[in-house]
Amino acid sequence: MDAHDLFRRLGVGAKFDLRRFSADAARFQIGKRKYDFDSSEVLQGLDFFGNKKPVPGDCGALRTHQELPDEEKTEESQIERKKQNRKKKKITSEITSEEEVSTIQWISSVEAKIEDKNVKRKNKLTSGKLEQLRKEKLNFFRNKHKIHVQGTDLPDPIATFQQLDQEYKINSRLLQNILDAGFQTPTPIQMQAIPVMLHGRELLASAPTGSGKTLAFSIPILMHLKQPTNKGFRALIISPTRELASQIHRELVKLSEGTGFRIHMIHKAAVAAKKFGPKSSKKFDILVTTPNRLIYLLKQDPPGIDLTSVEWLVVDESDKLFEDGKTGFRDQLASIFLACTSHKVKRAMFSATFAYDVEQWCRLNLDSVITVSVGARNSAVETVEQELLFVGSETGKLLAMRELVKKGFNPPVLVFVQSIERAKELFHELIYEGINVDVIHADRTQQQRDNTVHSFRAGKIWVLICTALLARGIDFKGVNLVINYDFPTSSVEYIHRIGRTGRAGHKGKAVTFFTEDDKPLLRSVANVIQQAGCPVPEYIKGFQKLLSKQKKKMIKKPLERESISTTPKYFLEKAKDKRKKVTGQNKKKVAPEDKS
């Protein structure tokens, strides 16, 4: 139907008002035509056989052979006119009604189409509003739990472990193990990290110490692997210390009980080479290890372990492993990453603190990485009461330590020192105070370290002296007090140290000794304490901040401190002189004999 037909149909029944628009009608010659000739003449010309005679004034009407009277003729003509008018009206009304019906139908169809479009628009708007409301709810949920996420196509967080069954079809035995272990609701890091890994996305995650990061990567790994196979290791977990690796291994074994997964840890490289070598049956699924032992196996010819089937590579305490120098494992990690050649491999980095180097590396090397952090970045746990204690000098530290012992404390207690030598010195000083104290450091054998950790967990040891490396990730349940005997070299190290207490929502306390020599490092640690809501002396806030170069220098080369000893200097110098005399006498030459 074109525009002309539409206009014609819409104009049905419209009449032109000749009286009102007479001038326009005359201009366009609209109206009745006035004839200036007699119609009888026309009729007479048409009578070829001369049968009829013209009647003047008949206006073209022909007379019949039998003429009717004027009255009857008038009545008959009126009746005929009425009939003709009725027929015309009927025909016109039928035509009009048909046209109106078709017009109405067409208009109704147009209206229906317009209504359909409006409904679709409403539906679109409704779906858009629903999506917007859903996003607002998710943002509210994340803000409530202090979850910060960066990335594209972010998976929705979970609020309960039952959602893993509803949305991801978790193994019923695995879910039961989670609930039996006492984990009723997921922690904030678990709420977001678990869905991210279940969607196969690469991850950089940071959360406070004791917030459940081990469970955050253990659950999705076990769900992803689904069931045991004989393809070799399909998941690899790297940690900086053997103690932390042992802890992760223990948690995974508990979590996977009854599922059949074979979870291994490298204790001795020689045994591992035979067990996991090329001639092995490959009846294993998950490996937990430290970098050095794994590198030793990879460098053998042929390699003592095959990582080509690894689908998930998790690096725990990633900021420590990415450090340069003797304490870091950056070179070893590069070799491990290259050994995992599967096209399915995904990587996840977990830590309590964000390191700039790790974040930049992840953004450059990981595919569509999602960054998840809980709380403020590089902040301490809010459940820990933090205190700075000025002790004046190195001698004052030991006096303050003994004062704490006299006042009484609630064990277990962790004491952090700067080096292995200082750990030994402090151990020899405290062992005579009548308290159960022990020390753990790298110079002790693995068996001694394991026994010490086991005794500390069992409550047989009240005070454990250790170096900073032990602060990484190890979960000592129920630690009530952390003492930073030597001031930490950075705010990151401080966060990891005090994170050994106040875990899983429990309250804890951290006391940090500082001397005049620690003044350059005070400002950064004081900021962390203040952010956690703990009081900081006003004069410390006025100290200058260290430049980044100075910070790195302090980390690589810590302050040289005096030896830990309460023996007065007079007796120390006297003993020193005595040793010199003894050594001097031993060096004296015997006089030659007189031969004459």
Swiss-Prot record:
Q: Which residues form the Helicase C-terminal domain?
A: 383-544
Q: Name one Pfam family in it.
A: DEAD
- Report the domain of life of the source organism: Eukaryota
Q: Which GO CC terms are listed, alphabetically?
A: nucleolus
Give start-end ranges for motif Q motif: 163-191
Q: Where is this motif: DEAD box?
A: 316-319
* Basic residues composition-biased segments: 577-589
Instruction: Please give the catalytic activity noted in the UniProt record.
Output: ATP + H2O = ADP + phosphate + H(+)
Residue ranges, annotated region (Disordered)? 68-94, 575-596
Give the molecular function GO annotations.
ATP binding; ATP hydrolysis activity; RNA binding; RNA helicase activity
Q: Which InterPro entries match?
A: DDX52/Rok1_DEADc, DEAD/DEAH_box_helicase_dom, DEAD_box_RNA_helicase, Helicase_ATP-bd, Helicase_C-like, P-loop_NTPase, RNA_helicase_DEAD_Q_motif
Where do the Helicase ATP-binding domain residues begin and end? 194-372
Q: ATP-binding: present as a keyword of the record?
A: yes
* Residues the record lists as N6-acetyllysine modifications: 15
Name the UniProt key words of this record, in alphabetical order. Answer: Acetylation, ATP-binding, Helicase, Hydrolase, Nucleotide-binding, Nucleus, Phosphoprotein, RNA-binding
Going by the record, the broad EC class of this enzyme is: hydrolase
Q: Which residues carry this modification: Phosphoserine?
A: 39
**Listed EC numbers:** 3.6.4.13
Quick one: which residues bind ATP? 207-214
Q: Name one GO biological process term.
A: maturation of SSU-rRNA
Locations listed in the record: Nucleus, Nucleolus
User: What PANTHER family would the database entry show?
Assistant: ATP-DEPENDENT RNA HELICASE RHLE-RELATED, RNA HELICASE
The family line of this record is: Belongs to the DEAD box helicase family. DDX52/ROK1 subfamily.
Question: What's the protein called, per UniProt?
Answer: Probable ATP-dependent RNA helicase DDX52
Species name for this entry? Bos taurus (Bovine)
Gene that encodes it = DDX52
